[in-house]
Each structure stands twice: as structure tokens, then as C-alpha cells.
Regions:
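A short glycine-rich, Lys/Arg-flanked "PGG" loop and its adjoining helix->strand segment in the class I
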Residues: 105-117
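Conserved SAM-binding strand-loop segment of SAM-dependent methyltransferases
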Residues: 68-79
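Conserved alpha-helix/loop element of class I SAM-dependent methyltransferases that forms part
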Residues: 2-21
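Conserved beta-strand signature within the Rossmann-like core of class I S-adenosyl-L-methionine
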Residues: 118-126
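Conserved SAM/SAH-binding beta-strand->alpha-helix loop
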Residues: 53
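Conserved class I S-adenosyl-L-methionine
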Residues: 20-29
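A short acidic, Gly/Pro-enriched loop at the edge of an enzyme's catalytic core
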Residues: 80-92
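A short SAM/SAH-binding and catalytic strip from SAM-dependent methyltransferases
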Residues: 90-103
Length: 160
């Protein structure tokens, strides 16, 4: 039912994805966005699927293997730290994850650490109001909001 309203293929058209990009799908769940993104970035790109749920990570691994996707790396976290190299990521996806986050400061500091200076953060926040999402992002002091449209927000890291 979720895909009926928020079809991943349609949603991904809104995001500036290119072949060769390194992408983090933070709060990847069962890989609804991870797998299509992996196809879009191609073999020269990479997608890090990050989640706190072992079953979600296992589901992504199994689906990626079935689809022959070798550019997906799963990361099971118990906090917000991913251990991905600093300033190495072109794009972070944060899709319908904000409602379950307990420590916004830790999450956004980690995302800021991961992003290249010209990297982007895409936030989709279907279960909270845009005004609340804007408040959360602005309160970090780490990002500049580039665009807000419907439930979507595109954000750039402020310089370090």
C-alpha cells in the first residue's frame, strides 16, 4: 500500500541521482529505495543501506543478491555512527525516518560528517508536518535548506 502512494521509482525522479554516486539510504528498511538507487548509480556507484533492524539489513542483502546488485553494502548500526569515511558521500536519503529518530543532533551530525561539501541530503517526511521537519533541520545549524516541495526537502551541508 505504501508503494501505491509513494512509488519509489516516481519519488527518485525528484532526486538528483547520477551514475557513479555514493549514496547512503539511512533507515533503509527492507530496501524499497536502496535497490532502485543501486541500479541508478550503476557499478561505478555504491549504496550504503543503513538500519538498526537486523531483519531489514537481511532483507536488503537477500534482495540485492537476488537482483545481482554488487554495489550495495549493508550497515547494521546500534547508534547513529556508520563508520563510513568522512566527506565521501554524494547523497544521503532520509525517507520517512524522522518520526523514529530519538536523537536528531547525533543523526544530523553523522550525516554532515558523511557528506562531501557539495553533497546533498534528501528528506521525505510523510508522517510529520513540513514545519516540524524544517525546524528539526534548521535547529542543527549544519544544513541549508535548498528546496521544500510537498513532503520533500533537499538540503545542503554548511561548510565545515
Amino acid at each position: 500500500l505504501f508503494d501505491l502512494f509513494w512509488n519509489p521509482q516516481q519519488q527518485l525522479k525528484k532526486i538528483p541521482l547520477k551514475e557513479g554516486m555514493k549514496v547512503v539510504d539511512y533507515g533503509c528498511g527492507p530496501g524499497r529505495y536502496t535497490l532502485p538507487v543501486a541500479k541508478m548509480v550503476g557499478l561505478k556507484g555504491k549504496v550504503f543501506a543503513v538500519d538498526i533492524q537486523p531483519l531489514a539489513i537481511k532483507a536488503v542483502e537477500e534482495k540485492a543478491a537476488r537482483q545481482g546488485l554488487t554495489n550495495v553494502e549493508t550497515i547494521l548500526v546500534d547508534s547513529y555512527n556508520t563508520d563510513i569515511q568522512d566527506s565521501s558521500i554524494d547523497l544521503v536519503l532520509l525517507i520517512d525516518t524522522l518520526p523514529i529518530i530519538k536523537d536528531y543532533d547525533a543523526l544530523f551530525h553523522e550525516i554532515h560528517r558523511l557528506l562531501k561539501p557539495d553533497g546533498l541530503l534528501f528528506v521525505k517526511h510523510g508522517r510529520i508536518k513540513m514545519s516540524r521537519t524544517t525546524e528539526i533541520v534548521e535547529n542543527t545549524g549544519l544544513f541549508t535548506i535548498i528546496e521544500c516541495r510537498g513532503h520533500d526537502m533537499l538540503v545542503a551541508p554548511k561548510t565545515r
